[in-house]
């Protein structure tokens, strides 16, 4: 304990004691002033803190309001929710800090001012009152004359009483001064300590809250970076679009109505003037839409649509050249007619054409819905690899007979296909279309992870299937492919995984089987053991028509090498020979498994490829198999003729249709400067001419941004089905048309 006033000096009442008293009183007075100032500053701090809390909570509410603006965005909603919750937690911690600060001020500083200093002031007042009494007693005692004995005794008694009172009060004052000195130190240090502890708690809570969001903040930063990049790209695209539209506007070009093909039929939108049916015949501008086989209009977006024609099949459209206003046309239904006006002659023609096309589309759709299915339609048709000539205007819709379940039943009926090719799980519902095998769902996922250069996976029940692809799957199958890829499994004593094996075991097996090809044997051994394969189980191919000229460079359909010598060929040559007449799909699969280049060039045969050789053999399945395994549909021979040229020269309509679906180049010319259409016209093959012209028309429409007609796809579907199910009929048809 610090002793500011010595008790001995206090009893002596020396000048040193009085000087100490004055110094202590000055210090205590200064302490009181500063403590009162600190209390005022603390009040201001607490008041400002409360204002900060109120403003912070209002700010958080404002952030929450941003999430309610516009359509909901999951990413922004999650971000705002997480951060507003975090901000609220921080504000709660700040409120706790303010409460702790206020409590500390009241408990330490305010108590010190009100209680500690009050006792000091009372002791000081008593001390100085005793000092004054002592001073008066001393003065009176000193002034009493010697002759006044009685008065002198009374003065002495009063002096002793005053001195005793003074000393008692002086000791009390000294004690109070010493106590207040220590209390000042303790209370101030405790106040600061509690304040710092409250601050530490506040910042620790904030640190924990930030740590809780650390991972999310990192992920959000990455997402925002990607969003900024995408936004920059979109901004650049919009600026380019803006420049183009501005140039178009400066060029005086009029805006075109929106024209597109959707799931509900042909759709066209744009502004037209409509003549009222009242007596005034007023004209008003409205937004018209052709959709769902209806013609409707509305004034504002929120207004309900008004139906002009409920069913486009029950109306017609005609021009109004006699009308007083220009660019008018009339839509006439069974119950009423509607006069409409476009902004220009070109827009008039577009609208009339759109209405006519919509009427035709409505009739076509009704016909397709009511028409019975043909018995030969065993599968859906979908051309995932179609060229631009077929792909524009939407993907081809599948044509199915009895549903895609019939495809699964047909493929699974092949010997060995009722079980998964790799793990023997029953009833597989997936397939690898370039390998020709069926797979369970787990093995199909592993095959998909290998990449399409190893395996192209398709569902037997969920996807649409081309008829030629279904026949290809039935021609190959698990037994044949496993004879190739598992030829040495027994000799190597390798255990094949079963249905109950883990995914890791199946994945290791599939990787070793198809990627590393550990179980393949040498070509001569495979050929000797399996003995090759005769003609496919489909219809025998029709003998090819002779080429246009003897030096045309067409690959001869007759095999140049005896079958006994095929085992000695390298894989590319083996693939080439196996694609000839009659093609052997197992041998082709064998060659591809041993690394044959699907686009291998036979220099001795005029740079012909296996696909060109299969074309000469008129084998739809061989061509489909090669295309599924990456054959180039536009690779030409030394005469500059690709597969489409050869199919056209030989009159193989089904193959020409297949190559067009797979993106064959319509404008490719041979060394004589002839494209496929020129050759087809020279050979007077009407079917191929029709296909080529339809493809060219579709290509031209796609270049102009127009949606195509379903007629194109219907014709290609019909030719595909005919080539797959009845190739002899297609050949006779081509021959009959050729001889007319």
Swiss-Prot record:
Name the keywords, alphabetized.
ANK repeat, Endosome, Lipid degradation, Lipid metabolism, Membrane, Metal-binding, Nitration, Repeat, Transducer, Zinc, Zinc-finger
For the region Disordered, give the residue spans.
525-562
Q: Where in the cell is it found?
A: Recycling endosome membrane
Query: Any idea where the BAR domain is?
Result: 1-226
Q: What is this protein called?
A: Arf-GAP with coiled-coil, ANK repeat and PH domain-containing protein 1
Gene designation per UniProt:
Acap1
The domain of life for this entry's organism is: Eukaryota
User: What is the species of this protein?
Assistant: Mus musculus (Mouse)
| UniProt-annotated stretches for the region Required for formation of endosomal tubules when overexpressed with PIP5K1C | 1-382
Q: Which Pfam families match?
A: Ank_2, ArfGap, BAR_3, PH
